[in-house]
């Protein structure tokens, strides 16, 4: 399976296969990558998705533009590089289990120096870079670490409501 994903889906690029599981019902943040991410739901899950094109010039994003999508157990979906997303949500208060396929090295610690968030502002997209191939915009209620850019405007969406 991994070899097929590397050869066909990712055009001979090495990939890493991991998982995300737990109990979540809130948006909390959005991230994006410069490459597609494959999600395969082992349990029913909800993905909250938005479009990178809707991020404002100051790198803020209006959460009312997000849409919720049910991913039934056993279903695989491609989350395009132009899609804002974050951790899946469970359905009806249940936990979720989702396998995640990304290019090798994605989400690894950064090795170089990058622009920092200054006085709550991201002066360039580089200030959003939180890990290798991972740009992140947080919500004030999302619990992200200090230094993260808090640029989600509006409600911290909750699929349990």
Q: What label would you give each PLM region?
A:
Residues 1-73, 86-161:
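Active-site region of the double-stranded beta-helix
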């Amino acid at each position: 399976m991994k070899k097929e994903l590397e050869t066909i889906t990712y055009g001979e690029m090495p990939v890493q296969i991991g998982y995300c599981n737990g109990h979540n019902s809130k948006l909390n943040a959005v991230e994006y990558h410069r490459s597609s991410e494959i999600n395969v739901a082992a349990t029913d899950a909800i993905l909250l998705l938005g479009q990178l094109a809707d991020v404002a010039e100051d790198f803020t994003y209006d959460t009312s533009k997000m849409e919720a999508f049910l991913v039934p157990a056993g279903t695989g979906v491609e989350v395009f590089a132009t899609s804002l997303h974050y951790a899946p949500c469970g359905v009806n208060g249940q936990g979720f289990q989702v396998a995640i396929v990304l290019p090798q090295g994605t989400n690894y610690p950064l090795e170089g120096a990058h622009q920092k968030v200054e006085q709550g502002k991201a002066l360039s997209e580089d200030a959003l870079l939180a890990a290798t191939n991972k740009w992140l915009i947080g919500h004030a209620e999302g619990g992200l670490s200090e230094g993260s850019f808090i640029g989600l405007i509006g409600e911290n969406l909750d699929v349990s409501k």
